[in-house]
């Protein structure tokens, strides 16, 4: 789940982009993660929902599909949307770095806007920037983002694309992931708790 852009112009641009894949969708909907949860609670769902907030529509909310860097004000606005979602209970943030408009964002920009994720001890899940020739660099980028944010990381659909890349860089990327996991320190190496303690 992601917030709907506040301005009608940005919302129309977003819906136009989505309709190419999803077909016609209604104009409107929640503007914030909190609004989304409120609407969700009014619906009789047959299952539990734990919806993340997506950085793609966060970016569209603050700057549309522009291929320019964030301004400081846009960075602060994007971070505030993510902060609000974390405070409302979002389990994490979903990144689609290979997709428009996120592909225009830098590592530094992601680290800045995702700062609340670490503070709230949540997770980022991501489609990396490249799964072919740039797979190793892309894996290193998201590891660096998670390290700087101080949060858990899940790489979605981890694979090596393109026949020339099969069996080539995947082992390096796996080694990088394993090294990053080994570098994470967990403060509670031992514990003892019984039901009586509770």
What does each model-found stretch correspond to?
Residues 1-91, 190:
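Divalent-metal coordination cores built from histidine and acidic residues
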Residues 2-12, 60-66, 107, 136-140, ...:
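Short acidic, glycine/serine/threonine-rich loops at helix termini
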Residues 55, 195-197:
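A very general structural signal that marks isolated residues within well-ordered alpha-helical segments
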Residues 187, 191-194:
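Conserved small/polar residues in nucleotide/adenosyl-binding loops
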């Amino acid at each position: 789940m992601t917030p709907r852009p506040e301005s009608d112009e940005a919302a129309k641009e977003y819906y136009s982009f989505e309709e190419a894949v999803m077909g016609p969708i209604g104009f409107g909907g929640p503007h914030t993660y909190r609004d989304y949860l409120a609407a969700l609670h009014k619906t009789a769902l047959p299952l539990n929902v734990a919806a993340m907030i997506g950085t793609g529509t966060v970016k569209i909310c603050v700057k549309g599909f522009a291929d320019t860097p964030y301004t400081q004000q846009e960075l602060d606005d994007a971070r505030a949307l993510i902060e609000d979602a974390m405070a409302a209970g979002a389990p994490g943030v979903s990144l689609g770095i290979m997709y428009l408009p996120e592909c225009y964002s830098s590592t530094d920009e992601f680290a800045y806007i995702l700062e609340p994720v670490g503070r709230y001890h949540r997770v980022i899940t991501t489609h990396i920037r490249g799964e072919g020739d740039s797979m190793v660099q892309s894996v290193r980028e998201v590891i660096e983002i998670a390290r700087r944010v101080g949060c858990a990381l899940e790489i979605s659909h981890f694979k090596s694309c393109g026949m020339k890349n099969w069996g080539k860089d995947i082992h390096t990327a796996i080694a990088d992931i394993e090294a990053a996991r080994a570098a994470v320190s967990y403060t509670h190496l031992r514990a003892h708790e019984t039901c009586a303690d509770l």
